[in-house]
Amino acid sequence: MKQILFAGVIGLFLTLVGTPLLIKLLARKGYGQYIRDDGPREHASKRGTPTMGGIAFILATVAAYFLAKGITSYLDPDIDAGPTFSGLLVLGLMVGMGLVGFLDDYIKIVKRRSLGLRARAKMIGQLTVGIAFAVLSLQFADNRGNTPASTKLSFITDFGWTIGPVLFVVWALFMILAMSNGVNLTDGLDGLATGASVLVFGAYTFIGVWQFQESCANALTLTNPGACYEVRDPLDLAVVASALMGSCLGFLWWNTSPAKIFMGDTGSLALGGVLAGLAICSRTELLMAILGGLFVLITMSVVIQVGSFRLTGKRVFRMAPLQHHFELKGWSEVLVVVRFWIIQGICVIVGLGLFYAGWATDK
C-alpha cells in the first residue's frame, strides 16, 4: 500500500516543480496554442499560451510509478514491489496515445494548422496503439490463469457474456478511441479536463485497492468470498491510477484559470487512453461510462449537435462541445468549469456507489 501513497505524492511533486520549467521551455521555442477563429471571443486572449503540457504529467506519471516501486523495495525488501505486466501495459497505452497527440500538437504549432494531423493519419495512429494494447492485454497469464484483460464484458466485474478475442479487440478499440476523444473534446476550458481526470483517477485508485483486498486469491480469508475479484495485478493498477491522480493534480495548479499551459492533444489523448486501459484491466468497462460521465456527456453533445444539423439543418446547442454552449449563454469560464467538476464528482460518487453495491449484494 505504501507504493500507492508514494506514487501519488511523487507525481504531485514532479508536476508542481516540473511544469513551470516546461512552460519556460515551450515559451522560448514559441510553442503556443493556436486558437480557432470560430470559438468564443473570450478565447482569443489564450492565443500563444504554451501547449503540449501533457508531456509534464506523462513523464511524471511514469517516473512516479517506477520511483514508488524503487523506494518501496528499498524500505521493505520483503515486499514484491516490482513492475507488473498490467501496470506496464496501461502505462504503454498512455505513452502511445500521448505520442499520437504530440504529433498532432506539433503540426498545429509548426505548420500553424489548427486541425493538426489529418483525420486519417490521426485515426491510424490511435488504431495502431489501441490494437497493440488490446492484443497484448490477452497475453501473459499469471499463475491463476488471469490475463490483464478478459474476453468477457464487464460492468463491476465480468459477467457471463463472452465475446471472443476478435470482438474484444474491436470493443477495446471503441473504448480507447471514445474515451481519448472524449477527454480531448472536454479539454476546451482552463482546468476542466485536468480536474475531472483527478476525480476519476482517484476513483480507480480506490477500485484497485478494493479489488486487491477482495481478490479471489485470498478467498479463504474474505468476509464475502462470493464477491471476490479475478483481476490481475489490481494493486499495481492502483499505483498507476494514484500516480496519474497526483500528476494531474500538480499540473492543475498551472492549468487552472488563467492557464499558464495547456495539456494539448498530447495530454488529452493520453489521459483518455489510460482511463480506458484502467477500465479494461480492472474489469469495469461499462462502469467507466459512469465514472467518466462528464467525458461521455460532452462527447454526446457533439454527436447530438452534428446529427441534428445533418438531419434537420438545425443546431440543438449554441455551440458544441457542451461547455461552449454555456459560455455563449453568458456563464463565465470559471463558473462552467466548477459546475462541470461538480457533475463529474457526482458521476464518481454514483459509480463508486454502484461498485460497492455490486460487491455487497453479490454473495
From Swiss-Prot:
GO cellular component, one term: plasma membrane
Keyword Cell membrane: yes
Obligatory cofactor(s): Mg(2+)
Keywords recorded for this protein, A-Z: Cell cycle, Cell division, Cell membrane, Cell shape, Cell wall biogenesis/degradation, Magnesium, Membrane, Metal-binding, Peptidoglycan synthesis, Transferase, Transmembrane, Transmembrane helix
Topology versus the membrane: Multi-pass membrane protein
Pathway: Cell wall biogenesis; peptidoglycan biosynthesis
Class of this enzyme: transferase
Membrane-traversing stretches: 3-23, 48-68, 83-103, 121-141, 159-179, 192-212, 234-254, 261-281, 286-306, 340-360
Catalytic activity as recorded in UniProt: UDP-N-acetyl-alpha-D-muramoyl-L-alanyl-gamma-D-glutamyl-meso-2,6-diaminopimeloyl-D-alanyl-D-alanine + di-trans,octa-cis-undecaprenyl phosphate = di-trans,octa-cis-undecaprenyl diphospho-N-acetyl-alpha-D-muramoyl-L-alanyl-D-glutamyl-meso-2,6-diaminopimeloyl-D-alanyl-D-alanine + UMP
Keyword Kinase part of the UniProt annotation: no
Top-level lineage group: Bacteria
Localization annotation: Cell membrane
GO biological process, one term: cell division
GO MF, one example: phosphotransferase activity, for other substituted phosphate groups
Pfam families, sorted: Glycos_transf_4, MraY_sig1
Protein EC: 2.7.8.13
Family from the record: Belongs to the glycosyltransferase 4 family. MraY subfamily.
Purpose: Catalyzes the initial step of the lipid cycle reactions in the biosynthesis of the cell wall peptidoglycan: transfers peptidoglycan precursor phospho-MurNAc-pentapeptide from UDP-MurNAc-pentapeptide onto the lipid carrier undecaprenyl phosphate, yielding undecaprenyl-pyrophosphoryl-MurNAc-pentapeptide, known as lipid I.
NCBIfam families assigned: mraY
Protein known as: Phospho-N-acetylmuramoyl-pentapeptide-transferase
Name of encoding gene: mraY
